[in-house]
Amino acid sequence: MALSRGTFYFGLALFFIVVELPSGSWAGLEYSQSFPGGEFAVCETCRLGRGKCRRTCLDSEKIAGKCKLNFFCCRERI
């Protein structure tokens, strides 16, 4: 009986270890953003959270600077 109980506890521990492993993602890092303005924010407007880094700005926005990787820092027009 001791062998089956030990096997049960081993299987239970193995189950909890497997459940805690991330499921193909980088443990939620794909949703984290480095700066409040966007994922690749480097210009001051985006760094302060007043703009968003996008490939193309919307019609209601203007370009306020450049971010990394061909992204523009877009800010609402006043």
Curated annotation (Swiss-Prot):
GO cellular component terms attached to this protein's record: extracellular region
Residue span of the signal peptide, if any? 1-27
> Which UniProt keyword terms apply here?
Antibiotic, Antimicrobial, Defensin, Disulfide bond, Secreted, Signal
Gene Ontology terms: biological process: defense response to bacterium; innate immune response
Q: Where in the cell is it found?
A: Secreted
Disulfide bonds, paired cysteine numbers: C46-C73, C53-C67, C57-C74
| UniProt keyword Metal-binding present | no
What the record says about family reads:
Belongs to the beta-defensin family.
Main function: Has antibacterial activity.
- What is the protein named? Beta-defensin 12
Q: Which organism is it from?
A: Rattus norvegicus
